[in-house]
UniProtKB/Swiss-Prot annotation:
The keyword Secreted does not apply. Keywords: Cytoplasm, GTP-binding, Ligase, Magnesium, Metal-binding, Nucleotide-binding, Purine biosynthesis. This is Adenylosuccinate synthetase. The lineage of its organism: Bacteria, Pseudomonadati, Pseudomonadota, Alphaproteobacteria, Rickettsiales. Binds 1 Mg(2+) ion per subunit. It is found in: Cytoplasm. Transmembrane segments: none annotated. It comes from Ehrlichia ruminantium (strain Gardel). It catalyses: IMP + L-aspartate + GTP = N(6)-(1,2-dicarboxyethyl)-AMP + GDP + phosphate + 2 H(+). Its EC number is 6.3.4.4. SUPFAM superfamilies: P-loop containing nucleoside triphosphate hydrolases. Substrate binds at T299, V300, S301, N302, R303, E304, R305. The gene is purA. IMP binds at D13, E14, G15, K16, N38, A39, G40, H41, T129, R143, Q224, T239, R303. GO terms for cellular component: cytoplasm.
Length: 430
């Protein structure tokens, strides 16, 4: 099996975790390459639900290497909590099956506090998860962030780095009349957590290089979705990292000479958590039905997801940005009850027709979707195990999506369970 990059083609929550978990069975390693514990992957195995935030989905498999790449911002306390919770549930996690990049920036409590403060300052709130992700990435770009490798330092060297970080954060706190953080206190906290983290730490770029030299199969697991990308998303209602497929090379530390199949995961309808434009949103009984049937609650935020019709304009743009080879279509069963289904094929604003998402947030907020209507199937697809099991109109819907997007559907997820997957085209598995 070739290397595979798995990315979401909407606003996240497409079902990437389940897909990566399923693919992991035939892979040697899985790499998380961006984001932090603001991402959430839900995986169901034999009716038991696992919720992952930082750990790659492969951690639930035996004899698979899970890698947290340099593109991830790492909350060490959240990571240890996640590890401890999985161990309680019988999952074996050790230095042989988990590796953490020495270059990961550290997410600390000061970042979470800063996240909350910055959200208060905004005229229009973004709907951040308040996990400290944005402020940590800001520190990284400003070259003052603490990184995992700093936990190896002697106390006096670490103190100087902490003090440099606090020169900024204490100034911010002062403006909000919040007491400053003492450098010595933060140093002690870091030295306390360090022994739990450091055994997992290695130069991840070298680990991945060695795997490629041995012709091992690697999956690169994206978090969030294309239109939460800091550069290509619906700015400013985006995350703080790049979420599209090319980031796998940067955030994992693998060079471009290694060929990969790029799988785009996409729901049969569209959802979004938090604020920001949503062109096909249904604030009516249709959206309510999608929400209820899809159990659309955010894994991390625990907020209700907004729901709407499938947006082919959004999907086409995402496919181009990541160079998607094939699609994984998820949650088809949520549409089972509709007698007719709509697909957005264009937008309209001020007399102009758009076949892409304009960058202007003002224009985005005023786009009107143009729909094509197709017949529904009013039959149950949940748990279907073969393509032939699907209703005729459900197959027609899938083919319509392929026709519009000009990319084949490789897999269809028919339920939350690990093996609830229909394989249409398996060439990427060879």
């Amino acid at each position: 099996m070739t290397n595979i990059v798995v990315v979401g083609l909407q606003w996240g929550d497409e079902g990437k975790g389940k897909v990566v978990d399923w693919l992991s069975n035939n892979a040697d390693a899985v790499v998380r390459f961006q984001g932090g514990n603001n991402a959430g992957h839900t995986i169901v195995i034999q009716e038991k639900t696992y919720k992952l935030n930082l750990l790659p989905s492969s951690i639930l498999h035996n004899n698979k290497l899970s890698i947290i790449g340099n593109g991830v911002v790492l909350d060490p306390y959240a990571l240890m909590s996640e590890i401890d919770n999985l161990r309680i549930n019988g999952i074996n996690i050790n230095t042989q099956n988990l590796v953490i990049s020495e270059s990961c920036p550290l997410v600390l409590n000061i970042h979470k506090e800063a996240d909350t403060l910055f959200e208060q300052l905004r005229q229009n709130t973004i709907g951040t998860t308040n996990k400290g992700i944005g402020p940590c990435y800001a520190d990284k770009i400003s070259r003052r962030a603490l990184r995992v490798c700093d936990l190896f330092d002697k106390k006096d060297i670490l103190y100087n780095k902490v003090n440099n970080l606090l020169n900024y954060h204490n100034l911010l706190r002062q403006n909000f009349n919040i007491l400053p953080i003492e450098a010595s206190k933060l140093v002690d906290e870091l030295l306390d957590i360090a022994p739990k983290i450091l055994p997992f730490v290695k130069p991840v770029w070298k680990v991945i290089h060695d795997l490629t030299q041995q012709n091992k199969t690697i999956i690169f697991e994206g978090a969030q979705g294309t239109f939460l990308d800091i550069d290509h998303g619906t700015y400013p209602f985006v995350t703080s990292s790049n979420t599209i497929a090319p980031q796998a090379f940067v955030g994992g530390g693998i060079n471009l000479s290694h060929s990969s199949c790029i799988l785009g995961v996409i729901k049969a309808y569209t959802t979004r958590v938090g604020n920001g434009p949503f062109f096909t949103e249904q604030k009516n009984e249709i959206g309510k039905s999608m929400f209820e049937r899809g159990n659309e609650i955010g894994t991390v935020s625990n907020r209700e997801r907004r729901c709407g019709w499938f947006d082919a304009v959004l999907a086409k743009q995402a496919i181009i940005l990541s160079g998607v080879s094939g699609l994984v279509l998820t949650k088809l069963d949520v549409l089972d009850q509709f007698s007719e289904i709509k697909i957005c094929t264009q937008y309209k604003y001020d007399g102009v027709i758009y076949d892409y998402i304009p960058a202007s947030s003002y224009v985005q907020n005023n786009l009107e979707p143009i729909y094509e209507t197709v017949p529904g199937w009013k039959e149950n697809t949940f748990g279907s195990v073969t393509y032939e099991d699907l209703p005729k109109n459900a197959i027609s819907y899938i083919k319509k999506i392929e026709e519009i997007l000009k990319v084949p559907v490789y897999l269809i997820s028919t339920g939350p369970e690990r093996n609830a997957m229909i394989i249409i085209n398996d060439k990427f598995l060879k």
